[in-house]
UniProtKB/Swiss-Prot annotation:
Entries under Pfam families matching the protein: GcpE (PF04551)
Listed pathway(s): Isoprenoid biosynthesis; isopentenyl diphosphate biosynthesis via DXP pathway; isopentenyl diphosphate from 1-deoxy-D-xylulose 5-phosphate: step 5/6
UniProt source species: Nitrosomonas eutropha (strain DSM 101675 / C91 / Nm57)
Full protein name: 4-hydroxy-3-methylbut-2-en-1-yl diphosphate synthase (flavodoxin)
InterPro entries: Dihydropteroate_synth-like_sf, IspG_bac, IspG_bac-typ, NO2/SO3_Rdtase_4Fe4S_sf
NCBIfam families (UniProt xref): ispG_gcpE, PRK00366.1
Amino acid sequence: MSSNNVPAPRRKCVGVKVGSVMIGGGAPIVVQSMTNTDTADELATVQQVEQLARAGSELVRITVNSMEAARTVPAIRARLDDMDCHVPLVGDFHFNGHKLLTAYPECAKALAKYRINPGNVGHGKKRDEQFSILIEMACKYDKPVRIGVNWGSLDPEMLARIMDENARSPDPLGASQVMHKALITSALESAARAEELGLGRDHIVLSCKVSGVQDLIAVYGELAAQCDYALHLGLTEAGMGSKGIVASTAALAVLLFKGIGDTIRISLTPEPGGDRAREVIVAQEILQTMGLRAFVPLVASCPGCGRTTSTYFQELAESIQIYVREQMIIWREQYEGVENMSLAVMGCVVNGPGESKHANIGISLPGSGETPVAPVFVDGQKTVTLKGDNIAGEFRVIVDEYVRTKYRKKVANA
């Protein structure tokens, strides 16, 4: 039993190898994302996959919905490998996946995992046949499968069966509970059928996606208690901007705190012209804020108030945040553990010095109306006071020096 302020131990589950990435089995929680390009557009898809991988996505899902898309997948994989981008690709199949995987074996081989929605692989006998073909292809090419159930596309026959059973029950469930049961039943029955067809438990990941925060928490709590498959977490559509971030964080934080979840995806609606990689950064920040993984040094900064020199303080905090994320591309390759470094950029003398001492490196500005004079604290000790017009640049030099001297340099592979 965990204490009230410590996350529960991770739920034990069967590990699933996806290319070079392990999901579940005690492995770190995996961050993944999905492209929104037409997969038949090779160049656009390669560029976006590379962008997402560079941002930190450890798996990238691509839509495979047409003959043109299926034909293009091997070329996408080859071009990414030529760019030294080896992120595993997951094929997202709906309606016609059985045909595409059968007709294009090179596509089947190039993908590291298949995503199947049991609610849209046909109905009745066709559903059984088409689902069987998908699983047989996964077995043939030794590929893991995510059986991804979605409340917007539940198998109508299965849903009708559960509703009929509920209607005959002396203690019937409410509508939302029936939906939860249907999602879980679809996932578990599909997984059991996949095993009957020869797919190992170590090749199966499950997800039951909904849009409501409370629904997601309830469904995954029940699903986690009923199986030991690896679980993929995420709202099916979180929304745009702050709403999407808040909804995803509210749902996933509760489940992750309970030890539930082996891979996550934040399904944000991009703003027009927005950066697709934002969903990757949000996923990383959720995990890092909860102490479950570390990706980049955390920069703590106060919100500002009437005591802060707002513009200068905000510009300094932003510049350090951007600098650290950009430098991590280099630091990650050169220094062990640098992602655990903590920084603080504080705006005034009320809490600034104290907060700065809690970080590995902290800087505290004096406050509103005063000439910028900023003491810097390194591992709790005041080391220097920065003045003048280049405080940000001098602080970056201090951060660089700290990284070089405090973190062990990685040994290059022989």
